[in-house]
């Protein structure tokens, strides 16, 4: 899935730039793909049991791993050329927190920067896989309006059989 779904979508987004933020890297599978394509990568993971081993594994590389809440990261405004999130939006405990995340993405993106993501659709088999886990699906039908409310626009959306992919941009001016 990473090489057939995620990587082509990231490459279709174009140049991610020199300073990229990955939100919710988990064990770092997508981090490994991204770090080979960008100069500098900051990965923000809220779960210490995932952030700590990822930080240790990637020590001395072009990746900085932070254990933090991505909805209030404390990172510099207008810093990142791109922000990514892969299969993590549905793990946010509420739609309100998803919207806070979108606002934080807007805050930390440079003008003209891109927000690239993939997430699961609301399907029975995906819900069954989250029985003991958070599953607050994002409706791709209203994603554009939610991103626009956060200040992001120029949405490109691709809805597949079990997931959707998106690219949005922070306006240049």
Model-inferred region functions:
Residues 84:
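A conserved beta-strand element that flanks and buttresses the S-adenosyl-L-methionine
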Residues 1-62, 67-72, 95-96, 116-173:
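Class I (Rossmann-like) S-adenosyl-L-methionine-dependent methyltransferase catalytic domain
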Residues 87-91:
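Short catalytic micro-motifs in class I SAM-dependent methyltransferases
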Residues 80, 97:
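Residue-level recognition of oxygen-bearing side chains
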Residues 73-78:
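Short amphipathic alpha-helix with an adjacent loop that forms part of the alpha/beta core around
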Residues 99-111:
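A short glycine-rich, Lys/Arg-flanked "PGG" loop and its adjoining helix->strand segment in the class I
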């Amino acid at each position: 899935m990473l090489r057939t779904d995620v990587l082509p979508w990231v490459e279709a987004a174009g140049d991610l730039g020199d300073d990229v933020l990955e939100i919710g890297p988990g064990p770092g599978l997508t981090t490994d793909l991204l770090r080979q394509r960008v100069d500098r990568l900051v990965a923000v993971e809220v779960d210490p049991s995932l952030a700590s081993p990822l930080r240790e594994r990637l020590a001395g590389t072009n990746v900085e791993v932070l254990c933090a809440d991505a909805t209030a990261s404390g990172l510099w405004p207008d810093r990142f050329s791109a922000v990514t999130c892969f299969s993590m939006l549905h793990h946010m405990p509420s739609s309100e927190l998803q919207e806070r995340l979108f606002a934080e993405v807007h805050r930390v993106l440079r003008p003209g920067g891109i927000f690239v993501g993939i997430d699961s659709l609301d399907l029975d088999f995906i819900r069954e896989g989250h029985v003991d886990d958070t599953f607050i699906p994002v409706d791709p039908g209203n994603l554009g309006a939610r991103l626009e409310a956060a200040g992001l626009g120029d949405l490109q959306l691709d809805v597949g059989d079990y997931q959707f992919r998106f690219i949005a941009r922070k306006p240049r001016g």
